[in-house]
Curated annotation (Swiss-Prot):
Location of the GRAM domain: 15-87
Gene3D superfamilies for this protein: Pleckstrin-homology domain (PH domain)/Phosphotyrosine-binding domain (PTB)
GO cellular component: nucleus
PANTHER family (alphabetical): POSTACROSOMAL SHEATH WW DOMAIN-BINDING PROTEIN, WW DOMAIN BINDING PROTEIN 2, ISOFORM E
GO MF annotations, alphabetized: chromatin DNA binding; transcription coactivator activity
One Pfam family of this chain: GRAM
Organism, as annotated: Macaca fascicularis
Start and stop residues of the Sequence repeats: 139-145, 146-152, 153-159, 160-166, 167-173, 174-180, 202-208
Domain of life where this protein originates: Eukaryota
Name of this protein: Postacrosomal sheath WW domain-binding protein
SUPFAM superfamilies assigned to the protein according to its UniProt record, in alphabetical order: PH domain-like
Keywords assigned by UniProt, alphabetized: Repeat
Length: 255
């Protein structure tokens, strides 16, 4: 059992250790100690407050309007013995038992406690308490508390939220690039504006094909390509001309 270690600063809340869950909360409960250890005045008198039941312990928080040396009182199940539920005829039901002091709990020895439920619910609270204590015996003590994350792990920058609905992992097969594949060298940029990919069926040029020499450019303005299936005739222009505008070909020079 520990004294004044389980309440918030203004006593309007309870401090529950990591790994535990809140099972029940009862208001208007009176706590007293018919038998207490000598040499401590924190157990004197009757305290009124709220009783909390977690998966590993019982915590009592005195009302914030009450001034006294005891602000909170915590009792782990493994330090409680002789637990009973009393049902007086002309008084409210109460839970009674013996509690041992916990190491570094703020007091030493043992004491007998009494919890009176002015709003009812003592039997239900005791049943849940026994069930939770049985689980502790079966599964062991609570796990170690979760501490702060290691240095360097902070909150994500603004704008980084959860992915939209339907967004999942990439399809299988998308992994690292094969060995030898690296980034493009400096100067390799994207295609110019207006560039379109070649239509389907255009593949790599045949072996032995070389690029045309420098200076070979496209046809001058006004020239159009020959219709499909028409090959170029030797020593004739590929451009169509009217009969009256045909150019005379120069005579071949004699060798």
């Amino acid at each position: 059992m520990a004294v004044n270690q389980s309440h918030t600063e203004n006593r309007r809340g309870v401090l529950i250790p990591n790994g535990e869950s809140l099972l029940k909360q009862s208001l208007n409960v009176e706590l007293s100690f018919p038998r207490q250890s000598e040499g401590s005045n924190v157990f004197n008198g009757t305290k009124t407050g709220t009783l909390f039941l977690t998966s590993y312990r019982v915590i009592f928080i005195t009302s914030h309007s009450i001034n006294g040396p005891m602000l909170s009182f915590m009792m782990p199940f493994d330090l409680i013995t002789n637990l009973t539920v009393e049902q007086p005829v002309f008084a409210a039901n109460f839970i009674k038992g013996t509690i041992q002091a916990a190491p570094y709990g703020g007091w030493e020895g043992q004491a007998t406690f009494k919890l009176v439920f002015r709003n009812g619910g003592a039997i239900e609270f005791a049943q849940l308490m026994v069930k939770a204590a049985s689980s502790v015996i079966a599964y062991g003590a609570p796990p170690a508390g979760y501490g702060a994350p290691p240095a360097g792990y902070g909150a994500p920058p603004p704008g980084y939220g959860a992915p939209p609905a339907g967004y999942g992992a990439p399809p299988p097969g998308y992994g690292a690039p094969p060995a030898g594949y690296g980034a493009q060298p400096a100067g390799n940029e994207g295609p110019p504006v207006g560039y379109r990919a070649s239509p389907a069926g255009y593949g790599a040029p045949p072996l032995g094909y070389e690029a045309p020499p420098a200076g070979n450019e496209g046809l001058p303005a006004g020239y159009r390509a020959s219709p499909a299936g028409s090959g170029a005739r030797p020593h004739e222009s590929a451009a169509a001309q009217a009969p009256e505008n045909e150019a005379s070909l120069p005579s071949a020079s004699s060798s």
